[in-house]
């Protein structure tokens, strides 16, 4: 498979088609946006500064694929991705999260992403170091060879001094190599050992109340560099010790300064922020009430989307080249209800179409992570073969579509609810089913859902 930087917009759309049904216009828009980023990197320096990303506004009801398109795109491109709800934020001066916290969160995600990549690169070396630490615990030097006590040295030092002969050293090395072989063969996985680990608990996190978590994290990070890291000894099995020690040893092998430098660059030039429910902060100008705060959030959001510098604990971050994708249903408000300056910062507008019954059929069958494929994989672990007939799939799609028309339209999410109810009995009885092949046809689907679908009140609560 090609690297992402070599993929054309058509190929990006084809990759997205593997997971998301329909919505071609939205896929095209995001594919062009990320391809333009790659093109920008190839420009001369003076032009690179001038070319800014074209932010996208997705308009469509819930459950049609807005978030999934952005998330899959970020995974495909290896970009730091953050999803936020516009309603989480409050105007500066009010209790709650300020909008610039989204940039700090994006940088944190970017740092963790780069750190994991670098740790993966040094994993083999880290495994060797973990093996040595486990052997140190399994074969401590003092236990492996008997000590020779020198009374004259004891008199001078005031304590016992251990001395080892060459023969003792040879025996110790032989014992250690023997244990190494057994360890590699997996014979010692259940042995209990005592290892020294660093404590990760933060003493400041419990002090601050709801809405103040960010402050607790910042203060904790500030003091973590000043206070020495506390270590404690823990008893655990060799298998558990390997999992605990591997990230600790890998972290020692990477250069955090380089990690932070690369992470900041990636966040600034490849970061994607998905702002959901932006329609909830849109509204006509009002002198009082909640609209004051909504207008304030929009005005606070404006400089970040336009391009500004936000201070983070890793250093300053420019937001000029971060791609912002905003989304909303816009049932009550319209995109034109956003303040004009913010509207201008989302020049690409894409309308996502509501899902049809045929779309539901395709969603159940086609994506690589399709719902029925997930259930088949889950129940195969119990030895149950789940077979969905064509009419069974169509019946599930028909019922989900009808429920969306009658009740609240929640898009493709309705399929999860319907599928869960259809397969509830099988999931419960799976370990005890004598017949390991189960066929889900239209009759079975109707039998499981008929009473609930017909009863309006039950449908509202259960489906």
Swiss-Prot record:
The UniProt entry, under NCBIfam families, shows: hslU, PRK05201.1
The protein's matches in SMART domains, at most eight in alphabetical order, are given as: AAA (SM00382), ClpB_D2-small (SM01086)
Which organism's genome codes for this protein? Thermotoga neapolitana (strain ATCC 49049 / DSM 4359 / NBRC 107923 / NS-E)
Q: Does the keyword Metal-binding apply?
A: no
An example of a Gene Ontology BP annotation on this entry? proteolysis involved in protein catabolic process
Which InterPro entries does the entry link to? Answer: AAA+_ATPase, ATP-dep_Clp_protease_ClpX, ATPase_AAA_core, Clp_ATPase_C, HslU, P-loop_NTPase
Q: Which residues form a coiled coil?
A: none
Task of the protein:
ATPase subunit of a proteasome-like degradation complex; this subunit has chaperone activity. The binding of ATP and its subsequent hydrolysis by HslU are essential for unfolding of protein substrates subsequently hydrolyzed by HslV. HslU recognizes the N-terminal part of its protein substrates and unfolds these before they are guided to HslV for hydrolysis.
| Similarity comment text for this entry | Belongs to the ClpX chaperone family. HslU subfamily.
Molecular function GO terms recorded = ATP binding; ATP hydrolysis activity; peptidase activity; proteasome-activating activity
Record text on subunit structure and interactions: A double ring-shaped homohexamer of HslV is capped on each side by a ring-shaped HslU homohexamer. The assembly of the HslU/HslV complex is dependent on binding of ATP.
User: Which residues hold ATP?
Assistant: 21, 63-68, 276, 341, 413
Q: Cellular component GO terms, alphabetically?
A: HslUV protease complex
Task: List the protein's name.
Answer: ATP-dependent protease ATPase subunit HslU
* Lineage, broadest ranks: Bacteria, Thermotogati, Thermotogota, Thermotogae, Thermotogales
Q: Which UniProt keywords apply?
A: ATP-binding, Chaperone, Cytoplasm, Nucleotide-binding
Entry annotated with the keyword Cytoplasm? yes
State the compartments where it is located. Answer: Cytoplasm
User: What Gene3D superfamilies does the annotation carry?
Assistant: 1.10.8.60, P-loop containing nucleotide triphosphate hydrolases
